[in-house]
Swiss-Prot record:
GO terms for cellular component: helical viral capsid. The lineage of its organism: Viruses, Riboviria, Orthornavirae, Kitrinoviricota, Alsuviricetes. Belongs to the virgaviridae capsid protein family. GO terms for molecular function: structural molecule activity. Coiled coil: none annotated. This is Capsid protein. Its main location: virion. It comes from Potato mop-top virus (isolate Potato/Sweden/Sw) (PMTV). Capsid protein self-assembles to form rod-shaped virions about 21 nm in diameter with a central canal enclosing the viral genomic RNA.
Length: 176
């Protein structure tokens, strides 16, 4: 009825209050992935352990491109606006996770022989690379990441619900 009388309510813009340069930088740099999606992907990689050598290039690309930055912004809510339940998100920039993922990348690059000639010299680089050792190293690195995903301190520090992330970072969502 209020609209019939010519009165209009000001629409509340969906955005974070108190958004500043620091928040924008965090959003640009931090990479996040759904906990469920990450767990499923990790399980697939671990199950493919015997074929990891054959698929090293593909897995290397997947690990290198894991998660995304700009997961939230001034006008895009962390985790999205239509959340159902307490969906969990993993921050891939947490020190232990970042180190573990970098170790997987190095192990996969070693499978492909990348950097071998530079490290060992041309003569040693042409020798057999030891596929079983490489596969074992990759499997070990994947197990390290799997262990992190159930580590209590990691879960407290680097796994977030929308509410927890906003609380920890002083973000308050305004709007519907």
């Amino acid at each position: 009825m209020a609209e019939n009388r010519g009165e209009r309510r000001a629409a509340v813009e969906n955005r974070y209050d108190a958004w500043d340069h620091e928040q924008a930088m965090k959003a640009a740099v931090r990479k996040f992935i759904s906990y469920d999606q990450f767990s499923a992907q990790l399980r697939n990689w671990r199950e493919a352990r015997l074929n990891i050598i054959e698929h090293a290039t593909s897995v290397l690309s997947q690990v290198s491109n894991l998660g995304r930055t700009h997961f939230y912004s001034r006008t895009e809510r962390f985790g999205g606006s239509s959340l159902v339940g307490d969906k969990l998100y993993v921050c891939l920039n947490e020190t232990r996770m970042k180190t573990a993922l970098n170790n997987i990348i190095v192990a996969l690059q070693t499978v492909n022989g990348e950097g071998r000639a530079r490290r060992l010299g041309p003569r040693e680089a042409s020798a057999n690379t030891g596929g079983e050792d490489s596969a074992l190293n990759v499997a070990h690195q994947l197990a390290e990441v799997d262990d992190l995903l159930t580590d209590e301190s990691f879960l407290r520090e680097a796994v977030f619900t929308q509410d927890k992330y906003e609380l920890v970072n002083g973000l308050r969502w305004a709007g519907a």
